[in-house]
Amino acid sequence: MTVPPPAELRAEELRVRIGGATLLDAVSLAFAPGRITGLLGPNGAGKTTLLRAVAGLTRPSAGRVVLDGEDLHALTARRRARRVAFMEQQADTRLSLPVRQVIELGRTPYRGRWPVPMDSAADAHERSVFAEAVAAADVGHLLDRAWPTLSGGERQRVQLARALVQEPGVLLLDEPTNHLDLRHQLGFLGAVRGLGVTTVAALHDLELAAAYCDEVAVLLDGRLVAHGPSSDVLTSPTIAHVYGVDVTVERHPRHDRPHIRWNGLLPEGTSP
C-alpha cells in the first residue's frame, strides 16, 4: 500500500493527571519513524492514556507531543486527522451502516462531508486509497455487510481499513489483536508491519510484541521503565519486575527474536 513518508513522533516529559490521579508521569519517548513500537505493561500501566495523548485526544497536564517538529496539540483536529490515525479497542459506530461507508468515514478529514461516495463520484486517488486499504486489511468480502452484523475480529479489521484511508504518517493501535483469532492476529500485525508507517501499538501478548515490534516501550504505574529493541528489553528481570511472573527468555530458533517461556507467578512483593 502507498503511504506518506513516515512521521517523526515523540513525547517530551509527558504528564497526564485526571481527577487528582497521575496517569502518566514524565514520559519521554521517541518513536522510531517507519517502524513498529510496542507499548507493553499490565492493566492500568498507562498504555491507553499515552496513546490518547499522542493522538491528540487527551491534553497533557505538562510536557508536549511533537509531530514532525510541530506541537501536536496546537494543530487543528482536521490537520491531526490527516497525519495521525487512532484505532481504539472498541469502535463507537452505533449506526447500522454498511462496511463500505464505515471505511469511507476515514476520508472525512479530506472530503469534509459524510458519507463520502467514493465508489461513484470520487477521483482516481480516492478510489485507489480505498482499494488499497481494503486489500491491506483483507475486508473486501465485508463491504456490503452491515456494521452490527460483524464479529469482533471483523470489526477490528474494518477499523484498520478506516484508519488506513486517512493516509496517516502515524498509526496508533490500542490492543488491536484483542478480538482476532490466531491466524488473523498474525495476518493483522504482518500487514501493519509491511506498511512502513510509524506505528505505536499497545499489546498484552509479549510473544506477538517480540515477533512483530521493532522496539518496545514498557510502562508501569504511568512511568516508562524500559525502551529499546525487544531483545534488549524483554528480559527475565524486566518481565518479573513489571508483570510479577517468572519466565525464561530464549532466542527463537527461526526468527532470532526473544521467545518467552512462562514458569509461573512470583509471590507478591518478590524482587527479581
Per-range role (PLM):
Residues E104, D119-L142:
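Conserved ABC ATPase "signature" region
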Residues G63-D71, R80:
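Conserved ABC transporter NBD signature motif
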Residues A55:
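Helix-to-loop junction immediately C-terminal to a conserved catalytic motif
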Residues L40-P42:
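The feature captures the beta-strand-to-loop junction immediately N-terminal to the Walker
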Residues L171-E175, L180:
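Catalytic Walker B motif of ABC-type/P-loop ATPase nucleotide-binding domains
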Residues S236, A240-P272:
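ABC ATPase nucleotide-binding domains
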Residues V165-G169:
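A short, proline-enriched helix->beta-strand linker immediately N-terminal to the Walker B motif
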